[in-house]
Amino acid sequence: MVYAFNWKKLSISAALGYRWDGKRCRLWFQTQPGSYNDERLIAFVRDLKKHLRGQAAILIWDGLPAHKSRKMKQYLESQRSWLEVETLPGYSPDLNPVEDLWSNIKGQELANRCVAGLGEAEDGVCSGMDRVRQSMLPFSFLHHAGLFF
């Protein structure tokens, strides 16, 4: 069997947004071919700002090199009026609710699949994101990370 698909060609960025009172959770995501770099992540944060409609937010993310670049740091500094950024300790995926999101989708929509191309892989990801959005799973991801209300 010849299998030419390479997972490194599809990247996904996601944000889980929790209200301070625990009444609502929102999920935003973006897929793209290739890898994320600081420019693409800045565009994702800009899109996130539009969705939040001026509401203040705390962004908690891991140590991906693009999160720590000089360009990203300068951009985040310019967004301090609405965005506070906290970085998770190194090697701590158990503290990141988005890691549980990835695990859930990989274990459901992407499990045991031999996709023919990026479009099919992206369809599986989008289907999984829709399923998670319509459930209470994001709250379980938060609880698993020890960050429950």
Language-model features: locations:
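Acidic/histidine-rich, metal-coordinating catalytic segments
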Residues: 45, 55-67, 96
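Short beta-strand segments
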Residues: 58-63, 86-89, 142-143
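Short, solvent-exposed loop/turn segments at secondary-structure junctions
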Residues: 17-21, 64-67, 91-93, 147
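Structural signal for conserved beta-strand scaffold positions within catalytic alpha/beta enzyme cores
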Residues: 28-29, 87, 109
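C-terminal anion-handling pockets and recognition modules
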Residues: 98-149
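Distinct, well-ordered alpha-helical segments
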Residues: 70-74
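Electropositive, glycine- and tryptophan-enriched low-complexity nucleic-acid-binding patches
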Residues: 1-55
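RNase H-like polynucleotidyl transferase catalytic core
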Residues: 1-3, 77-100, 113-114
